[in-house]
């Protein structure tokens, strides 16, 4: 029963990938790379010079604390990195960029490829602190597919009414 939506979700992911990824290749962009910080007490959202709701900051800080103190990757870090990168993709003025914007990430660096603007309306550049060096992800298709699957998961199921 749960597989009924898999076809439309796959089609949505495929469509969005070509609309947002392939359409933005080849533009004249500037690459900004945010490398790791040596101070492990600086959390991911606090290290970013961007203001977001405090509950996101708490989740990010808890995930980073877990990784730093145990050495194990915490799955929440990956998901929150995706969420943050998608915010940059959706609102490029956060990092003084104009569209098109591409975001790439690994454990030690988040790369924003965009046309840089000197506007004062943006909130500045970003810095992150990651641990797992093997994490290499292309953000947008992963995040869009994840949210599409999440949306489908919480959609109300059709109910059969007996006669």
UniProtKB/Swiss-Prot annotation:
Residues 142-158 are annotated as: Important for peripheral membrane localization. Glycans are attached at residues 28-29, 49, 96, 106, 118. Changing residue 28 to H: Not glycosylated, no cleavage of the signal peptide. Not glycosylated, allows cleavage of the signal peptide. GO terms for cellular component: extracellular region; host cell endoplasmic reticulum membrane; host cell Golgi membrane; membrane; viral envelope; virion membrane. It is found in: Virion membrane; Host endoplasmic reticulum membrane; Host Golgi apparatus membrane; Secreted. InterPro entries: EAV_Gp3 (IPR004310). N-glycosylation for overlapping sequons occurs at both Asn-28 and Asn-29, and blocks cleavage of the signal peptide between Gly-26 and Ser-27. Changing residue 28 to Q: Not glycosylated, no cleavage of the signal peptide. Not glycosylated; allows cleavage of the signal peptide. Residues 1-26 form the signal peptide. It is a peripheral membrane protein. It holds the Pfam family GP3. GO terms for biological process: clathrin-dependent endocytosis of virus by host cell; virion attachment to host cell. Changing residue 29 to Q: Not glycosylated, no cleavage of the signal peptide. Not glycosylated; allows cleavage of the signal peptide. Keywords: Clathrin-mediated endocytosis of virus by host, Disulfide bond, Glycoprotein, Host endoplasmic reticulum, Host Golgi apparatus, Host membrane, Host-virus interaction, Membrane, Secreted, Signal, Viral attachment to host cell, Viral envelope protein, Viral penetration into host cytoplasm, Virion, Virus endocytosis by host, Virus entry into host cell. Belongs to the arteriviridae GP3 protein family. Heterotrimer of GP2b, GP3, and GP4; disulfide-linked. The GP2b-GP3-GP4 complex associates with the E protein. Minor envelope protein. Part of the glycoproteins heterotrimer GP2b-GP3-GP4 which is probably responsible for the attachment to target host cell. This attachment induces virion internalization predominantly through clathrin-dependent endocytosis. This is Glycoprotein 3. It comes from Equine arteritis virus (strain Bucyrus).
